[in-house]
């Protein structure tokens, strides 16, 4: 099977300078979801039709997958029919009979639905549409004959009949031949017009029925919001089924690549940004925001914690309230419980970082790195001016501003000595 992805539309109804397929769904561009589906289907070849505005970003996203993806620009003929023609021409020396055409703005279509359509091909149909029930009048509708055969796809504003998603599976030679016979409407070729042409030539057209939420296209911000809501519902259901505890599922938000193992507990109002993996037994408390980080077994994060920038929280660690960790690693059983910022640092095992500790990692031009060893104690309200190395079993006195390395088992004190004036209040 070969796959064609049509992603050259301008998306003017999004009212945005950002191309439609690059808007985010599940914290990833819409088109990434379609590329992920294509990757799961393991086609022999794949072609994506884009425009100049998205060609570079799409090529970069395609590189994240194992697809043999050929990117071509929309040809002179506008419309989905023109795009499909350009794509099929790019698939030179065809070796596959079947071609699957996907739309770049239909991100939630799943493998099961596509496989159902492909199975329908094997039962006699030459072209198979993906249809769904919808009250939304923006979609084309399947028109059936008296015997139940597909006659055409109507583009009126009514909501009678099944809507079509645009995705089509079929035999390459059949689709190519039908595309070649289409006429332009309003200066464009419409891919769905091949349905009427097929019916006129007694070519059997079938359809499979999908869930509207999976088959919907995204054309407006409202559509994007609906798709995001359903994406989150699917993610929540998947994690609950796999053994993750979500104490209030509707208040937890995931990304396309979120990985959470069984026996993790997630409390309300947690946001998982891109690139997060959480190992078994960890607990994420409310109002925490995680992105590009690895939370290992038994760690506790939050509430009100932010972990980001390729950070690692090791086994049994505690990251408490109002703590931010960026581009840092926290060793096994270490704790940073309150009101702290750790940036560009490596913290060893069994180290305690006191409340209000700040690692000053930016010198005005570059980020600097600090290392704190195993079994260290960092007193409250300490400031560590990177780059600093603190040896194993060392301690930093509360309120210190550390600007020099500390050898193992040493105590660093960097603050003014206290002055006490007896009876000061009485004299005044």
UniProtKB/Swiss-Prot annotation:
Main location: cytoplasm
Location relative to the cell: Cytoplasm
Residues binding acetyl-CoA: 355, 361-362, 398, 415
EC number: 2.7.7.23, 2.3.1.157
Pathway participation: Nucleotide-sugar biosynthesis; UDP-N-acetyl-alpha-D-glucosamine biosynthesis; N-acetyl-alpha-D-glucosamine 1-phosphate from alpha-D-glucosamine 6-phosphate (route II): step 2/2; Nucleotide-sugar biosynthesis; UDP-N-acetyl-alpha-D-glucosamine biosynthesis; UDP-N-acetyl-alpha-D-glucosamine from N-acetyl-alpha-D-glucosamine 1-phosphate: step 1/1; Bacterial outer membrane biogenesis; LPS lipid A biosynthesis
Disulphides: none
Catalysis performed (reactions): alpha-D-glucosamine 1-phosphate + acetyl-CoA = N-acetyl-alpha-D-glucosamine 1-phosphate + CoA + H(+); N-acetyl-alpha-D-glucosamine 1-phosphate + UTP + H(+) = UDP-N-acetyl-alpha-D-glucosamine + diphosphate
GO process annotations (BP): cell morphogenesis; cell wall organization; lipid A biosynthetic process; peptidoglycan biosynthetic process; regulation of cell shape; UDP-N-acetylglucosamine biosynthetic process
Cofactor(s) of this protein: Mg(2+)
GO MF annotation: an example: glucosamine-1-phosphate N-acetyltransferase activity
Region (Pyrophosphorylase): 1-221
Function recorded in the entry: Catalyzes the last two sequential reactions in the de novo biosynthetic pathway for UDP-N-acetylglucosamine (UDP-GlcNAc). The C-terminal domain catalyzes the transfer of acetyl group from acetyl coenzyme A to glucosamine-1-phosphate (GlcN-1-P) to produce N-acetylglucosamine-1-phosphate (GlcNAc-1-P), which is converted into UDP-GlcNAc by the transfer of uridine 5-monophosphate (from uridine 5-triphosphate), a reaction catalyzed by the N-terminal domain.
Designated name of the protein: Bifunctional protein GlmU
């Amino acid at each position: 099977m070969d796959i064609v992805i049509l992603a050259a539309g301008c998306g003017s109804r999004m009212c945005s300078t950002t191309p439609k397929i690059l808007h985010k769904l599940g914290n990833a561009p819409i088109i990434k979801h379609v590329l992920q589906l294509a990757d799961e289907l393991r086609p022999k070849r794949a072609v994506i039709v884009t425009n100049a505005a998205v060609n570079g970003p799409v090529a970069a996203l395609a590189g994240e997958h194992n697809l043999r993806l050929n990117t071509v620009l929309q040809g002179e003929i506008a419309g989905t029919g023109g795009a499909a023609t350009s794509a099929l021409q790019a698939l030179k020396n065809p070796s596959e009979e079947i071609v699957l055409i996907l739309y770049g703005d239909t991100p939630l279509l799943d493998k099961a639905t596509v496989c159902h359509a492909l199975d329908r091909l094997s039962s006699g149909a030459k072209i198979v549409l993906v249809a769904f029930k919808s009250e939304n009048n923006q979609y084309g509708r399947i028109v059936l004959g008296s015997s139940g055969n597909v006659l055409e796809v109507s583009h009126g504003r009514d909501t009678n009949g099944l809507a079509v998603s645009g995705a089509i599976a079929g035999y390459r030679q059949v689709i190519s031949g039908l595309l070649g016979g289409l006429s332009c409407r309003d200066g464009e070729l419409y891919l769905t017009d091949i349905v009427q042409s097929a019916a006129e030539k007694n070519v059997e057209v079938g359809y499979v029925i999908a869930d509207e939420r999976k088959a919907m296209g995204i054309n407006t911000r409202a559509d994007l919001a609906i798709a995001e809501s359903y994406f989150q519902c699917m993610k929540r259901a998947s994690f609950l089924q796999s053994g993750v505890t979500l104490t209030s599922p509707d208040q937890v938000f995931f990304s396309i690549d979120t990985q959470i193992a069984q026996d993790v507990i997630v409390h309300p109002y947690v946001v998982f940004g891109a690139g997060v993996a959480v190992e078994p037994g960890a607990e994420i408390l409310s109002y925490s925001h995680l992105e590009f980080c690895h939370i290992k077994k038994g760690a506790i994060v939050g509430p009100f914690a932010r972990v980001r920038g390729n950070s690692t929280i090791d086994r049994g660690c505690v990251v408490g309230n109002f703590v931010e960790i960026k581009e840092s690693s926290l060793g096994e059983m270490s704790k940073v419980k309150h009101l702290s910022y750790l940036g560009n640092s490596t913290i060893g095992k069994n180290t305690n970082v006191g409340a209000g500790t700040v690692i000053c990692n930016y010198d005005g031009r570059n980020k600097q790195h600090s290392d704190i060893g195993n079994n260290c104690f960092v007193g409250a309200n300490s400031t560590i001016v990177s780059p600093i190395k603190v040896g194993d079993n060392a301690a930093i006195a509360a309120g210190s501003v550390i600007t020099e390395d500390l050898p193992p088992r040493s105590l660093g004190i960097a603050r003014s000595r206290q002055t006490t004036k007896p009876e000061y209040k009485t004299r005044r």
